[in-house]
UniProtKB/Swiss-Prot annotation:
SMART domains associated with the record: CULLIN, Cullin_Nedd8
Segments of this protein annotated with the region Disordered: 568-596
InterPro entries: Cullin, Cullin_CS, Cullin_homology, Cullin_homology_sf, Cullin_N, Cullin_neddylation_domain, Cullin_repeat-like_dom_sf, WH-like_DNA-bd_sf
Keyword line: Cytoplasm, Isopeptide bond, Nucleus, Ubl conjugation, Ubl conjugation pathway
GO cellular component, one term: nucleus
Annotated protein name in UniProt: Cullin-3
PROSITE patterns attached to this UniProt entry: CULLIN_1, CULLIN_2
Gene Ontology biological-process entries: programmed cell death involved in cell development; protein catabolic process; protein polyubiquitination; protein ubiquitination; striated muscle myosin thick filament assembly; ubiquitin-dependent protein catabolic process
Gene: cul-3
Disrupted-gene phenotype: RNAi-mediated knockdown at L1 larval stage results in the disorganization of myosin thick filaments in adult body wall muscles characterized by the formation of abnormal myosin heavy chain myo-3 aggregates and V-shaped crossing of A-bands. RNAi-mediated knockdown suppresses the age-dependent paralysis and growth arrest induced by exogenous dipeptide repeat protein PR50.
Modification after translation: Neddylated. Deneddylated via its interaction with the COP9 signalosome (CSN) complex.
Gene Ontology MF terms in the entry: POZ domain binding; ubiquitin protein ligase binding
């Protein structure tokens, strides 16, 4: 039908067909038909049913407003059916087929409810959707099974007990039908209708409690007797793996995670201190015996243990504490070891081995964990710097390495060795102390030609420069520049002296050092032998002619010389009355003449000057040597001790006074005519060790402290010049930040240097705030 509106538009109207009403008898007949069909479906006799006809009948009832009757009727039919199913389940409760009966009834019920839902789909879509207080057809069936079966006559408790018993058998490696457990778990989850409550209440919580009790008993056995932490943790990991495999087969995924958490709590968290500190089997035992596999396992297990009252900070914190304690104990034993303190190379080697071990552990066992890495670095820094000689020892190790230790290694191995020792260098807090010693040893290597390779030296300098900046290596690089000039200087001097009328009787090489660059100790001028004096005067003349305005000051402390010596031994039967010296024979046996022995003695400059005196004296006292040569007393005694009291194979001189270790000024010395050596070239080593004595350490420390005062003052001036005004705390913080790569200045020293700068009028206190300072231009 169509019509026109007043404005000329068209309107379309749809007329619904007339819906005839149905009487009560028809409704009753329709319901009875549906009821019988539902019951047949529940009995699994649905082959003769017409689902299309049944759907139309249900549709008609809902369409004519009889949905409530249909819904309530369905509810009654389901409850009646559940009652009959319950009887069958109760009868099987004491038989071995209980779980199978439950599973079968559940499967039949869910299949039937799917079919019933399809028949009553229109009721779900219309009646159920319009009434919020009723459940959809399928969920109605689930609710009925839960209330009429699961929670009746102890059926739910019996299901739980049966499941727990099967799981207990499975844990004891008995064969079970795990499919039955999985089906029961799936059923309990489905009965929750979009919630895990039923599953959790009926099964999961009891399972977790039973798991906790079971493994608590198991742990007691594993921790008893002679079992150690390595055995215990291996058993824990096996149990965790088995339980995870078991859970993945027939338990819910969320339950698997909860079970593993319970096991972590019961098996690890509750015993964590016992595991870590177990006597002859804990973390210390693993570290001492390099049990890498066990350390990897304990890290893997402890990583799962979170922060709790039982384990504050978590499992890794407890593990890290124990590992750190071992590292500190081992490192402290190294830096305090009396034998190692006498041998700096072994001292550093032990530390490097410890560092390599823990670096390897960090990668292989501890998964490069950042907290472990930071703690290891902190611990190394702590115990390394607890020994104030560490900077000296690291410098000595580098010195030994750069002399001859790297000649037989490849470039890659050399670079690896340098990188390793640079790691220890980074841990040093007093890098300025290291620098002072390193300069001394570098100077000796360069001056005495003891360096294995200039390339290796420069490679190390490059690493130091990268680590500490160009200011740290500036003077070191200048020392190498001086060395490069020596060759040119030596060649031109040789050409110059060839043209001179005065000829030198000795071959001499003089090296010019830039003042302020080389860490040499100034020595008072000594009296040089005539040959040396002439050579020095010629070189001075040559150098001052070539470099106008420069002044040369001779320093004999770091020189060396080859001295030709001839020893005239007495007859073989003669006996000595002195320390390794000659004397008249005390026996009547025949004398056998011995040939003179010609040697080349490799000595330092002062030793050479001392030895040349014996060309003019048969014997001479220490006092006389000092008077004639002007060598300082301490230096003179050191060299005499090396020449007369050193190794037997190096005793060029003999002392006339026997028995004393220390040399007195009255002691007299003579040439040791009995001196013998298989070597033609004999190198005389200084008796004093490489490590500084206590007075030398104090002297070096004092020099370092004096240098630090200047560095602190320079840093204060730099900062204040840039900031103009700054309060005390901020100034201290900035000075510390600037200098920490060389040393850690104490607030007291900084305050003292501030006061000095105020007195010298570089700074002034602020008039309004006496805790603040102003820079005075």
């Amino acid at each position: 039908m169509s019509g026109r509106s007043g404005n000329g538009g068209q309107q379309k109207m749809r007329i619904r067909p007339f819906m005839a009403t149905i009487d009560e008898q028809y409704v009753t007949q329709t319901w009875e038909l549906l009821k019988r069909a539902i019951q047949e479906i529940q009995r699994k006799n649905n082959s003769g049913l017409s689902f299309e006809e049944l759907y139309r009948n249900a549709y008609t009832m809902v369409l004519h407003k009889h949905g409530e009757r249909l819904y309530n009727g369905l509810k009654d039919v389901i409850q009646d059916h559940m009652a009959s199913v319950r009887i069958r389940i109760i009868e099987s409760m004491n038989s071995g087929s209980f779980l199978e009966t439950v599973a079968e009834s559940w499967a039949d019920h869910t299949v039937a409810m799917v079919m019933i839902r399809d028949i009553l789909m229109y009721m779900d879509r219309i009646y159920v959707a319009q009434n919020n207080h009723v459940l959809p057809v399928y969920n109605l069936g689930l609710d009925a099974y839960r209330t009429e079966i699961l929670r009746q006559n102890g059926i739910g408790d019996r299901i739980r007990d049966a499941l727990l018993e099967l799981i207990k058998l499975d844990r004891k490696s008995n064969q079970i039908n795990w499919h039955g457990i999985k089906n029961a778990c799936d059923m309990l989850i489905s009965l929750g209708i979009d919630s895990r409550t039923v599953y959790e209440d009926e099964f999961e919580r009891p399972l977790l409690k039973e798991t906790s009790d079971y493994y608590r008993d198991v742990c007691k056995n594993w921790l008893s007797g002679d079992n150690d932490a390595c055995f215990y943790l291996a058993q824990v990991e096996i149990a965790m793996h088995d339980e995870a495999s078991r859970a993945s087969r027939y338990l819910d995924k969320m339950t698997e995670a909860k079970i593993l958490q319970v096991m972590d709590d019961v098996m690890v968290a509750e015993h964590i201190q016992t595991i870590v500190y177990m006597q002859n089997g804990g973390v210390k035992f693993m570290l001492e015996h390099k049990k890498i596999e066990d350390l990897t396992r304990i890290f893997r297990i402890f990583k799962r243990i979170g922060d709790s009252v039982t384990v504050p900070g978590g499992g890794l914190k407890a593990l890290l504490k124990a590992v750190s304690e071992y590292l500190n104990e081992t490192g402290s034993n190294i830096v305090k070891n009396e034998d190692l303190l006498k041998n700096p190379v072994n001292f550093v080697n032990e530390l490097l081995q410890l560092k390599d071990y823990f670096s390897s552990l960090l990668t292989t066992a501890f998964a490069d964990d950042r907290d472990f890495k930071n703690r290891f670095q902190h611990d190394f820094e702590t115990f390394l710097n607890s020994n104030r000689q560490s900077p000296e020892f690291v410098a000595l190790y580098m010195d030994d390495m750069l002399r001859s230790g790297l000649k037989c290694v490849s470039d890659a191995e050399m670079d690896n060795k340098l990188d390793n020792v640079m790691i220890l260098f980074r841990y040093l807090q007093e890098k300025d102390v290291f620098e002072k010693y390193f300069k001394q040893y570098l100077a000796k290597r360069l001056l005495l030609d003891k360096s294995c390779s200039d390339d290796v030296e420069k490679a190390l300098l490059a690493k130091l420069k990268t680590e500490c900046g160009c200011q740290f290596t500036q003077k070191l690089e200048n020392m190498f520049r001086d060395k490069e000039l020596w060759l040119t200087l030596a060649t031109s001097f040789r050409d110059w002296r060839e043209a001179q009328p005065t000829k030198m009787s000795i071959d001499i090489s003089l090296r010019v050092l830039t003042a302020g660059v080389w860490p040499t100790v100034q020595c008072n001028p000594v009296v040089l032998p005539q040959e040396l004096s002439v050579a020095y005067e010629m070189f001075t003349q040559y150098y001052t002619e070539k470099h106008t305005g420069r002044k040369l000051t001779i320093n004999t402390l770091l020189g060396n010389a080859d001295v030709k010596a001839t020893f005239y031994p007495p007859p073989k039967a003669s006996m000595s009355n002195e320390e390794n010296g000659p004397g008249p024979s005390s026996s009547g046996e025949s004398m056998k003449e011995r040939k003179p022995e010609h040697k080349i003695l490799q000595v330092n400059t002062h030793q050479m000057i001392i030895l040349l005196q014996f060309n003019h004296h048969n014997r001479i006292s220490c006092q006389q040597l000092m008077d004639e040569l002007k060598i300082p007393e301490r230096e003179l005694k050191r060299n005499l001790q090396s020449l007369a009291l050193g190794k037997a194979s190096q005793r060029i001189l003999v002392r006339k006074n026997k028995g004393k270790d220390a040399i007195d000024m009255s002691d007299e010395f003579a040439v040791n005519d009995n001196f013998q050596s298989k070597l033609t070239r004999v190198k005389v080593q200084m008796v004093t060790g490489k490590v500084e004595s206590e007075p030398e350490i104090r002297e070096t420390r004092q020099k370092v402290e004096d240098d630090r005062k200047l560095e602190v003052e320079a840093a204060i001036v730099r900062i204040m010049k840039a900031r103009k005004k700054l309060n005390h705390n901020n100034l201290v913080a900035e000075v510390t930040q600037q200098l920490r790569h060389r040393f850690m200045p104490s607030p007291i020293i900084i305050k003292q240097r501030i006061e000095t700068l105020i007195e010298r009028e570089y700074l002034a206190r602020d008039e309004h705030d006496h805790r603040a300072y102003q820079y005075i231009a």
